[in-house]
Amino acid sequence: MQEEAKRYAVVTGANKGIGYGICKKLASSGVMVLLTARNEERGLKAIERLKKEFDLSDFVIFHQLDVDDPASVATLVSFIKTMFGKLDILVNNAAVTGGKLLNGDALLRKRNGEEIDSKEVGYETYDLGEKCLKTNFYGVERVTEALVPLLKLSSSPTIVNISSRAGLLKNISNEWARTVFSDIDNLTKEKIDDVLKDYEKDYKEGSLDIKGWPTFASAYTMSKAALNAYTRIMAKKYPHFHINSVCPGFVKTDMNHNTGNLSIDEGVETPVMLALLLNDGPSGCFFTKGEVIPF
């Protein structure tokens, strides 16, 4: 590959699961991939596996990243400046569930429409929910804002936000929040913050149900709804970027006790397709199974 044609990617939360699968696919496509993970030991093990099992030594390197830590993000930015001088692709994958899954089979049955008590599936707490918003939304925002200057140096800057159908507007039961997130012409990051602050306040007070917020996978749903809103804002702000949200589907990962119906390789197909977009691709969209669906 000619040096001037080389493309550079960052994937967050990539030591396993979907993030790891995206790294493997991008590196196999000739992209130089910076695999990041909060846990350095696990991240280095992932890199060694990619090198030994898939012969990708020339296309993968590791850097530690905690998306919740501004200092960690700043260190990553400095590293990319020194090593690459620019960035072409950012895949925001790092995420947590906002709860503790206790029974994968019960989760599967609930997803399939059975009347299952949520307590049988697992439990959610305010502290776990707060952490979920911090990582899944504010972590993405922090990393993205820090890397935009390097993405601007690319001829085809691309951001892929790994989201979920859970965050679609039809699943946001609070009418005010749904209205705010739907009003793309007037949507701002400050308005997203206002919604999340109201949500956190009601969560802390134990009034999610009476205030009309989601009560199952509550913080996860709200974090992904906020992420989708952020995708749309950023796509408007940077019209020469490709910025999209994508639901990889119900993929077998640790997050769902491997109850998903898709393999990692199947789940990463659409995220990788979006990551490799060149000049004429879509932006400001929500993708799943290779197709655009309404937010």
Regions found by a protein language model. Give the residues of each.
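N-terminal Rossmann-like NAD(P) cofactor-binding module of classical short-chain dehydrogenase/reductase
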Residues: V10, L34, D88-V91, V160
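Hydrophobic/aromatic anchor residues within beta-strands of the central parallel beta-sheet
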Residues: V60-F62, I243
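Catalytic loop of short-chain dehydrogenase/reductase
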Residues: V96-L133, K152-K236, C247
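Hydrophobic positions on the long internal alpha-helix
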Residues: V91, G139, V143-L147, L151, ...
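The beta1-alpha1 cofactor-binding region of Rossmann-like NAD(H)/NADP(H)-dependent oxidoreductases
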Residues: E40-E41, Q64-S78, Y126, F137-V140
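C-terminal helical subdomain
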Residues: R142, A225, S245-T253, H257-F295
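Hydrophobic structural elements of the Rossmann-like NAD(P)H-binding subdomain
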Residues: V91, V160, I243-V246, N256
